[in-house]
């Protein structure tokens, strides 16, 4: 891994032994003080966050009971279990709908054809690690007072949906695509649990990230982002096709045309000028203008080699703390890059002022 600047802390946030606590959305009002995992040193394991309800895989029988339409896509595996064809976009979307209904109390969820269909276990993992980051060992935060900014929410709105239902967080979700935001608005309209907790904002300047979205006097405990990591549409299409080929390698099948790709995603969901490195550089540069309005800035970083330029850019700013949190999800390794302009003492004052009784 690239060597981080002196103030950087690298955390291998892997699941320690122990059973995660499961929680149902109907109990959301009782889960204001979500317990956090303060143990961040452990040998890397192929496991989700210990609080992730998906840590033991999918209970397809329970999911089918919650959303019967899933039954049409479920097949027995050679190992004696049940699964779906993850290269089939309709199957994956139906699985997501069932997961959201069964585990998170979301009665309606849909995405336009070709839009990015996110893997829910990995998405909610990001949120659990952010809860740990925010708490910094304080087990008594009032979580439903937390405000979060989601940059590039897409048509699926998955991070705000999960964050509202798991933690009771309040969200502002931005995107440069008005069609994507309209789809998320439709999801909000049909899920009363999201009413008053999720606000949408159109980013009118495609070259900006925080500017034009964060308003004067507005305060966020966290910002989060899953940045587009390709530099062109052609590169994005090839990357998605490669994923499908890998999935189908052991099935003796031929990958479908790009239009049929489960991994989907269009425009800003998958690519931007300069790809992930340029997007992260812009985000870091803009963050200094909102240093006093956001406690923690965070973003996923898909490629390890993109960390070094981020560290270099952050070292030039008046950043107090930088953390890199490694997440292991099956055979996939991804990272959360987090930085704060506030000292540990100031972060504690912030938490006491805004997130405590």
Curated annotation (Swiss-Prot):
It is found in: Cytoplasm. Its main location: cytoplasm. GO terms for biological process: rRNA base methylation. Gene3D superfamilies: Vaccinia Virus protein VP39. This is Ribosomal RNA large subunit methyltransferase F. Specifically methylates the adenine in position 1618 of 23S rRNA. GO terms for molecular function: 23S rRNA (adenine(1618)-N(6))-methyltransferase activity. Belongs to the methyltransferase superfamily. METTL16/RlmF family. It holds the Pfam family Methyltransf_10. HAMAP family: 23SrRNA_methyltr_F. It comes from Shewanella sp. (strain W3-18-1).
